[in-house]
From Swiss-Prot:
Name the record gives this protein: tRNA N6-adenosine threonylcarbamoyltransferase
SUPFAM superfamilies recorded: Actin-like ATPase domain (SSF53067)
PANTHER family found in the cross-reference section: TRNA N6-ADENOSINE THREONYLCARBAMOYLTRANSFERASE, TRNA N6-ADENOSINE THREONYLCARBAMOYLTRANSFERASE, MITOCHONDRIAL
Signal peptide annotation: none
Encoding gene per record: tsaD
Class in the EC hierarchy, top level: transferase
Originating organism: Agrobacterium fabrum (strain C58 / ATCC 33970)
Length: 365
């Protein structure tokens, strides 16, 4: 193997346009040389959510410039990269088309191999880039489009242990915020309001707590929030804070039960693992401090290492896409043909049962 491999990564699956140059050294260590992300928050905030057509147009307008900026920041030219990695799914099909077609064009023009990357795999492998984790480990992905507990056995080897049967957790945060008249994105707005609220004022449900299966459900909690708000309308600022705090507490207690059962299962299935077992958290909701504290305490109780990559690498970014490509290259996996097509739905675990449920990105992958 050469002393290092260098990849250009491209990410356009939802409402962030991103490009990155990442290096994998011969010892397996990863290094982010440049990482450029352009958020579309302003374009979508007036609509209270992501508008697919607007997102796709924004990717078209920004991506070429971001690729140039990523190369400039890294001090390299296209000739210096070993491959191109572009998100191919899951996500909004318009955005995926923009990023994948750009990746194909660059790969063709520069004579470089193309790796079409599963966005979820990027999240799953990020902890190996940031913390050098060894396989296997558990990953909790909590975002606007996905809520999944996944066993990460190896590159390309994923086993879904739990998923949402209805709303994704990030979607529940956004809808709660919208119901209460809080700004988009809803996650930070709910968290900020909750800091001033009484988490015990409203006894909100904790969906699926106590069940042996490791799946999640948040639609009932969202409905309970609506009922609580309607019952005391019109809402004062303190009412809103109390509802947010109660909602956040219910979410944290639900995750504590669901993930706690997952950690116990991991110990049973991997009793002789070398070193400390690990739980990785990824996705935009992973920025929530109460959720992080809950998961940290849970890991401490079960003897797990809690790994939360920096916030900028928990949300959508191109560094994780580049790294996933590097992981595949390092294993000698074949590059993708330029005819590869984007996939709006692309589960990490292809053998897992498809559950009913729709989030911002459509059917749960």
């Amino acid at each position: 193997m050469p002393p290092f491999l260098r990849i250009l990564g491209i990410e356009t699956s939802c409402d962030e346009t991103a490009a990155s140059i990442v290096v994998r050294h011969a010892d397996g260590r990863g290094e982010i040389v440049s990482d450029v992300v352009l958020s579309q928050l302003e374009e979508h905030s007036a609509y209270g959510g992501v508008v697919p057509e607007i997102a796709a147009r924004a990717h078209v307008e920004a991506l070429d410039t971001l690729v140039e900026e990523a190369l400039d920041q890294a001090g390299v030219k296209l000739a210096d990269v070993d491959a191109i990695a572009a998100t191919s799914g899951p996500g909004l099909i318009g955005g995926l088309l923009v990023g994948l077609m750009t990746g194909k064009a660059i790969a063709k023009a520069a004579g470089k191999p193309l790796y079409a990357i599963n966005h979820l795999e990027g999240h799953a492998l990020t902890a190996r880039l940031t913390d050098g984790l060894s396989f296997p480990y558990l990953m909790l992905l909590v975002s606007g489009g996905h809520t999944q507990l996944v066993l990460v056995r190896g590159v390309g080897e994923y086993e879904r242990w739990g998923t949402t049967i209805d709303d994704a957790l990030g979607e529940a945060f956004d809808k709660t915020a919208k119901l209460l008249g809080l700004p988009y994105p809803g996650g930070p707005a709910v968290e900020n309001a909750a800091a001033k609220g009484d988490p015990d004022r409203f006894p909100l449900p904790r969906p699926m707590v106590g069940e042996a299966r490791l799946d999640f459900s948040f639609s009932g909690l969202k409905t309970a929030v609506r009922q609580a708000a309607t019952a005391i309308a019109p809402l004062s600022e303190q009412d809103i804070a109390d509802i947010c705090a109660s909602f956040q507490k219910a979410v944290s207690r639900t995750l504590k039960d669901r993930i706690g059962r997952g950690l116990a299962r991991f110990k049973v299935e991997f009793p002789h693992i070398n070193g400390e077992p690990a739980l990785v958290v990824a996705g935009g909701v992973a920025a929530n401090q109460e959720i992080r504290q809950t998961l940290q305490a849970l890991c401490d109780t079960h003897g797990f290492r809690f790994v939360a990559p920096p916030h900028r690498l928990c949300t959508d970014n191109a560094a994780m896409i580049a790294w996933a490509g590097l992981e595949r290259m390092a294993e000698g996996r074949q590059a993708d043909a330029l005819e590869v097509a984007p996939r709006s739905r692309w589960p990490l675990d292809g053998s897992a049962e498809t559950l009913i449920g729709f989030g911002k990105r459509g059917a749960k992958a």
